Swiss-Prot record:
Basic and acidic residues biased stretches: 133-162, 169-178
Organism, scientific name: Ajellomyces capsulatus (strain NAm1 / WU24) (Darling's disease fungus)
Name used for this protein in its record: 60S ribosomal subunit assembly/export protein LOC1
A GO biological process held by the record: mRNA transport
Any one cellular-component term (Gene Ontology): preribosome, large subunit precursor
Superkingdom of source: Eukaryota
Compositional bias ranges of the Low complexity kind: 7-36
Residue ranges of the region described as Disordered: 1-71, 133-207
Annotated gene: LOC1
Compositionally biased residues, Basic residues: 195-207
InterPro entries in the cross-refs: Loc1
Amino acid sequence: MAPNRGSSSKSSSKPSNKSSSSSKSKSKPLASSSRVSKPKPKSSIRRPLPKEVKAKPRTAPENLKKRKKRIYTEKELDLPQLNMITPVGVTKPKGMKKGKVFVDDQESMMTILAIVNAEKEGQIESKMMKARQMEEIREARRKEAEARQMAKKEKLEKVKDSLRKKRRPDSGEGKGDGKNSSSGEAKEFSSSKTSRSKPNRKRVSFT
């Protein structure tokens, strides 16, 4: 009976080992999944250094270059054409060199020149007339100002003469009156001084 027990113990020990190994193998992945990754310290992370961006000055050759402005044509701008009479010689055809281009019809050219000359002459004449009128107005104003000044001077002279005539006849009488008046004034002044120096005293009578 003893050998049977031993075999049973051996057989019972083997499956226990297998179950323990399987439990260990199952527990390993659980442990790895349950672990939390720790954040790395900031010192270990290397960032690229910031680069200095230097602004280009205005005197830089790139900024000094003149940019050509685009010139738009009449077709691109869609400008309306004005109703004007333009002779053939005025409009410059494309692809032609600079120079005078005369009109075939001399009569039309002469009419245009006559109209332009008449307008210019009229403007010049109007300017000349205006200038003459302004000169006449200025002369009239000057004459008025001179007449006013002369009238003022005459009035002043008349007033001066009247004052001089009044002073001349009163000069002889004024001398004698002046002496008498001066003596009277001196007496009055002396009497006023004495009255001030000697005040009025009250008199009391015992009865």
